[in-house]
Regions:
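Periplasmic OmpA-like peptidoglycan-binding domain that tethers envelope proteins to the cell wall
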Residues: 425, 435-508
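Membrane-anchoring helices that localize proteins to membranes
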Residues: 42-73
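Short cysteine-rich clusters marking metal-coordination/redox-active sites
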Residues: 6, 30-33
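Flanking scaffold residues of small Cys/His-coordinated metal-binding clusters
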Residues: 1-6, 24-25
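Short linker/helix segments within small regulatory modules
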Residues: 18-29
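Short Cys/His-rich micro-motifs in 6-15 aa windows
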Residues: 33-42
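Flexible loop/hinge segments at secondary-structure junctions
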Residues: 63-402, 407-411, 488-490, 503-508
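Short Cys/His-rich Zn2+-coordinating modules
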Residues: 5-18
Length: 508
């Protein structure tokens, strides 16, 4: 049996917020209006029914009630005594701060645990988050081992973790190794946790306003040592960088340095605020930093070959247009024996979970309306359409080599439906603007971009939303280089804009 809610605003089932039970094998549609249902995880009903049952189980039979629900617990071997109910492993970017914050909130808010503690594990880069579940006599522990993204997939393959955390996509060979657990690239197993972005900052007196990605790499690897070499005012470049254990450094290394080493003369900092202040006080300084720490320094716009420079901000990172942005992932078996896996992932992707993502210094996927100005080189029709409109903080993108929406887009569709549902708004003023890469003939790319926008329009209408305009702009306004597969994939997108935003804002 599956459960879902209707989000067709003209349907009384949706208006009442009724949860619809759908037998397995039946179409997942509203029985009243026929619209697709938005899936409701079973965990959403636990506090009202199932958790009460488990509390009674625990009260009479000890921990066995929880064991029945979540699988046999494992005793911890760390400094936190108790039984392990969930294991995460992988990325240090996720595991150092965000992972523990999500685990702590999950224990408190979803499992109603008391006396929740966050403690270092017995091994470096490991954390134990524990609490007392209702009716239980011993502590329940969520363990997080943050030893790098590769260990997420190794841990899943070896059965050493329940959820793999990664700051990159699963590689083809890793997916093949894990095929017994399901298709790791499929919707059931690949979950976008949040977005990460890094700003390149200079002194406010530095006249330089933009850099290409390759120039940033040359600067921080020491291949370029004077500002004049990148079009700036002559003067020696002073490098400031975060320490090796920083998630910000991990992101920068993956997106910029790659196999190149950071120049040995770089001044390293453990504190982002201190690094930002150092650049702000050095006329020749340059550094990289998380978005919240730009402060008195100046962020420069970043460009890839053939694409316009973009400044780092919440919108450009949320839409993934900014070159130094990346997705953070959770990977799970298609059918995990641990019944806490799905509830944890659902919580992490929920509005409450995404608020925690934002509080941890990353960019959440909660939808926002943002003021945006069309670039000067945009097509005249594009500028006219988006004038006085607001842009929604997401782009819809597609699976590599296919016309299907990717896994993030599928979740974003539900976020979009909820966003407009909360406003009691049917999307009459929504603009869907499609784009393509530049491979092949322009006329074909114009049609492809329109087809992508129509695909999103179809999904909107299945959810009771009625966009007023669907248009394609072909290869215009690339946000990434068309010389690479990743760049072309980024350029194949659909933007969402909203006319009459003042009317919507008034309803909030």
């Amino acid at each position: 049996m599956r459960q879902g809610k209707c989000h067709n605003f003209e349907c009384s089932t949706a208006a009442r917020g009724t949860v619809v039970d759908v037998p397995d094998g039946s179409e997942f549609r509203c029985p009243e209006c026929g619209s697709d249902l938005r899936k409701v995880g079973a965990w959403h009903h636990l506090p009202a029914a199932f958790v009460v049952f488990l509390i009674v189980q625990a009260a009479f039979f000890g921990f066995s009630g929880w064991e029945w629900a979540f699988g046999a617990p494992r005793k911890t071997s760390s400094r936190t005594e108790g039984s392990v109910i969930l294991r995460l492993a992988g990325s240090n970017t996720i595991g150092s701060g965000l992972g523990p914050a999500l685990a702590e909130a999950f224990l408190k808010q979803q499992l109603q645990a008391s006396d929740v503690r966050v403690q270092a594990g017995a091994v470096a880069e490991e954390t134990n988050i524990s609490g007392l579940l209702p009716g239980a006599h011993s502590r329940s522990v969520i363990t997080i081992a943050a030893h790098g993204s590769a260990t997420a997939f190794a841990g899943l393959a070896e059965g050493k973790c329940d959820i793999g955390a990664a700051s990159r996509k699963v590689k083809p060979d890793e997916a093949r190794t894990l095929s017994a657990l399901g298709d790791m690239t499929a919707f059931a197993s690949e979950h976008v946790l949040g977005l990460d972005g890094v700003a390149v900052i200079v002194n406010s007196t530095n006249p330089l306003t933009s850099l290409r990605v390759d120039q940033v790499a040359q600067i921080f690897s020491g291949a370029v040592t004077d500002w004049a070499q990148v079009g700036g005012k002559p003067g020696p470049i002073t490098i400031y960088a975060r320490d090796d254990k920083s998630g910000t450094y991990d992101t920068f290394k993956n997106l910029i340095l790659g196999s190149n080493a950071l120049v040995s003369t770089a001044h390293r900092y453990e504190d982002s605020n201190q690094l930002s202040d150092a650049v702000a006080n050095d006329a020749n300084g340059v550094g990289f930093i998380g978005l919240p720490y730009i402060h008195s320094a100046k962020a420069v716009a970043i460009a890839t070959t053939g694409a316009r420079p973009l400044l780092p901000n919440l919108l450009t990172v949320a839409t993934e247009d900014y070159p130094l942005s990346r997705r953070l992932f959770l990977y799970t078996p298609e059918n995990s024996p641990n019944r806490l896996v799905r509830p944890f992932v659902e919580f992490a992707l929920s509005k409450a979970g995404q608020d925690i993502v934002a509080n941890a210094g990353f960019v959440s996927q909660n939808i926002r309306l943002e003021r945006a100005v069309a670039p000067a080189d945009a097509p005249k029709a594009y500028r006219a359409l988006t004038q006085a409109a607001q842009r929604l903080s997401l782009d819809f993108r597609f699976r590599t080599g296919k016309s299907d929406l990717d896994n993030k887009a599928l979740v974003d569709l539900e976020r979009m439906a909820a966003f407009f549902s909360d406003l009691r708004y049917r999307g009459e003023d929504v603009l869907l603007l499609g784009f393509a890469d530049n491979t092949g003939v322009r006329a074909v790319n114009l049609q492809l971009s329109l087809d992508r926008a129509r695909k999103v329009n179809e999904e909107f209408r299945r959810r009771g939303l009625k966009p007023s305009l669907v248009e394609g702009f072909g290869p215009d306004l690339p946000v990434a280089s068309n010389d690479t597969d990743d760049g072309r994939e980024k350029n194949r997108r659909v933007e969402v804009w909203l006319k009459g935003a003042t009317t919507v804002a008034a309803r909030e």
